[in-house]
């Protein structure tokens, strides 16, 4: 299935107007000619993590709408939805049955009880110390209702104890049947792309980091890709890992996220030097989705491990913190840098990270749109939103700094901002200009400049950025064969 080589929007189901119907109205009113696709962050009933602890996929959270709202949107846009392939909610019917009946539950094999890893079911500290942890311990303890016995079950994620997010055993035939049902549901309502969220964590194996365990993970990924394809669905893998892992996935034909680009662009604009960006652009896989911002923070570790000196990385992090950002940190000393650098993600809006400088922000988007891949723009970034400190204070969740919900009046006002109008014009150019379906060139220039070019047949467009001033221009050949200069 051919995906549209056009910019996509990323949004929560309730962040642009309050629900899916209003989201569709907003898209039709303001952005009908702007986006080729829409990534709707989890609209399913969920018990936590703003949708990422799914109770069921068979229905949409009623306050957001119904599956038919998704189907209507799919008439005009490539729809992308998340499949939390690593876990489900502890309030799902499957885990609720397990909580009641324990090992006698017909769904017991869907979950990872500790005896699947350690024969006696007792965790070994030395093994856990080798793991790439997302919480202090990778399991939670639950009491079984009918027996009163305690069961320890694997829970990679979750900020509560016990966790709301219960890991699935992807080697279980029950889990594979469950995933097939999800693909079928998605296909029935017009979903074209499925993002496998947290897929790097699905294989648990003692003696490893329990993150992207090779070669076992490839068996699962190949199975998932084949099954999704049978329903006309493309898979997009969400894997935060070292650069080498991204290359391995790309070589196996998987669509992946370019999680390295956001920090690289930020570094380039803050330091007014193209060196890191040029080195990266010459060595990255092509079949990627590009982004600068998303519902999580700007990736740092482990995505940039080996690509940047931690001292230089810390300088950029410190500037972002001065501009209002907060940080998500790495758990486990083994996965921190030797000098103790432990920043996992920088939580802030991309516009705020660039000090709300319109020209710098448009330069960043121009770099993103000229980088090979399908670009995605997060809804806060679309409206050049600033850090939402009130949301952080209210929720005690650092990532809420970049998850502001916009009402209709606020959307109308934001769309009229000069920086947003300039961004919309740039998005339209990226979508419509034919050369972006051609060949990409990185042009030699001074270190304080950027020159990137796309060519196809008689069409050519060249991006020039003066990093000293952030002035951004695009020279292109129009339909009459004339050279036009476009000041972004």
From Swiss-Prot:
Active site: 197, 238
Thermal properties of activity per the entry: Optimum temperature is 55 degrees Celsius.
SMART domains: Aamy
EC number: 2.4.1.329
Binding site for sucrose 6(F)-phosphate: 49, 87, 195-197, 238, 295-296, 342-345, 399
Secretion signal span: none
Matching Pfam families: Alpha-amylase (PF00128)
pH dependence: Optimum pH is 6 and 6.5 for the synthetic and phosphorolytic reaction, respectively. Thermostable. Has a half-life of 60 hours at 60 degrees Celsius.
Annotated GO biological process: carbohydrate metabolic process
Catalysed reactions listed for this entry: sucrose 6(F)-phosphate + phosphate = beta-D-fructose 6-phosphate + alpha-D-glucose 1-phosphate
SUPFAM superfamilies assigned: (Trans)glycosidases (SSF51445)
The keyword Transmembrane helix is annotated on this UniProt entry: no
Domain of life (superkingdom): Bacteria
Swiss-Prot/TrEMBL keywords: Carbohydrate metabolism, Glycosyltransferase, Transferase
GO molecular function per UniProt: 1,4-alpha-oligoglucan phosphorylase activity; hexosyltransferase activity
Annotated site location: Transition state stabilizer: 296
Keyword Repeat carried by entry: no
Function: Catalyzes the reversible phosphorolysis of sucrose 6(F)-phosphate into alpha-D-glucose 1-phosphate (Glc1P) and D-fructose 6-phosphate. May be involved in a new pathway for the degradation of sucrose, which could become phosphorylated on its fructose moiety during uptake via a PTS system. To a lesser extent, can also reversibly act on sucrose in vitro. Is also able to catalyze transglycosylation reactions in vitro.
Similarity comment text for this entry: Belongs to the glycosyl hydrolase 13 family. Sucrose phosphorylase subfamily.
UniProt subunit comment: Monomer.
Protein's name according to its UniProt entry: Sucrose 6(F)-phosphate phosphorylase
């Amino acid at each position: 299935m051919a995906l549209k080589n056009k910019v996509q929007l990323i949004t929560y189901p309730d962040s642009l107007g309050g629900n899916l119907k209003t989201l569709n109205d907003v898209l039709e009113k303001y952005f009908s000619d702007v986006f080729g696709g829409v990534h709707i962050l989890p609209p399913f009933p969920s018990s936590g993590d703003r949708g990422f602890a799914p109770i069921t996929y068979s229905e949409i959270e009623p306050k957001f709408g119904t599956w038919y709202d998704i189907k209507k949107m799919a008439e005009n846009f490539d729809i992308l939805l998340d499949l939390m392939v690593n876990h489900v909610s502890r309030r799902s019917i499957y885990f609720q049955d397990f909580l009641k009946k324990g090992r006698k539950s017909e769904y017991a094999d869907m979950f990872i009880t500790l005896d699947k890893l350690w024969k006696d079911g007792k965790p070994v500290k030395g093994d856990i110390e080798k793991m790439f942890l997302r919480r202090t311990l990778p399991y939670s303890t639950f009491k079984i209702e009918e027996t009163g016995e305690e069961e320890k079950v694997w829970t990679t994620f979750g900020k509560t104890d016990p966790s709301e997010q219960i890991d699935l055993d992807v080697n279980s035939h029950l889990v594979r049947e469950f995933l097939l049902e999800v693909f079928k549901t998605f296909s029935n309502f017009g979903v074209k792309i499925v993002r496998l969220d947290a897929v790097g964590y699905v294989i648990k194996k003692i003696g490893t980091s329990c993150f992207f365990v090779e070669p076992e993970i490839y068996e699962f990924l190949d199975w998932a890709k084949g099954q999704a394809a049978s329903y006309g669905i493309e898979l997009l893998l969400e894997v935060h890992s070292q650069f080498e892992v991204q290359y391995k996935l790309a070589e196996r034909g998987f669509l992946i996220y370019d999680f390295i680009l956001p920090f690289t662009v930020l570094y380039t604009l803050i330091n007014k030097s193209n060196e890191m960006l040029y080195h990266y652009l010459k060595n990255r896989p092509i079949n990627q989705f590009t982004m600068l911002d998303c519902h999580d923070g700007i990736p740092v570790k482990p995505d940039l491990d080996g690509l940047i000196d931690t001292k230089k990385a810390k300088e950029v992090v410190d500037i972002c913190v001065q501009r209002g950002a907060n940080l998500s940190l790495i758990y486990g000393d083994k996965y921190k840098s030797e000098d103790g650098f432990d920043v996992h993600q920088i939580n802030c809006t991309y516009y705020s990270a660039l000090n709300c400088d319109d020209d710098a922000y448009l330069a960043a988007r121009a770099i993103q749109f000229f980088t090979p891949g399908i670009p995605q723009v997060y809804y806060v970034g679309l409206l050049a939103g600033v850090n939402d400190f009130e949301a952080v204070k209210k929720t005690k969740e650092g990532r809420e700094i970049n998850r502001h919900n916009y009402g209709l009046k606020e959307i109308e006002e934001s769309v009229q901002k000069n920086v947003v109008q300039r961004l919309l014009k740039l998005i339209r150019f990226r979508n419509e200009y034919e050369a972006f379906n051609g060949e990409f060139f990185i042009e030699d220039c001074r270190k304080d400049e950027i020159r990137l070019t796309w060519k196809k047949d008689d069409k050519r467009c060249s991006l020039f950025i003066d990093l000293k001033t952030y002035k951004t221009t695009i020279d292109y050949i129009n339909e009459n064969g004339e050279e036009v200069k476009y000041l972004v």
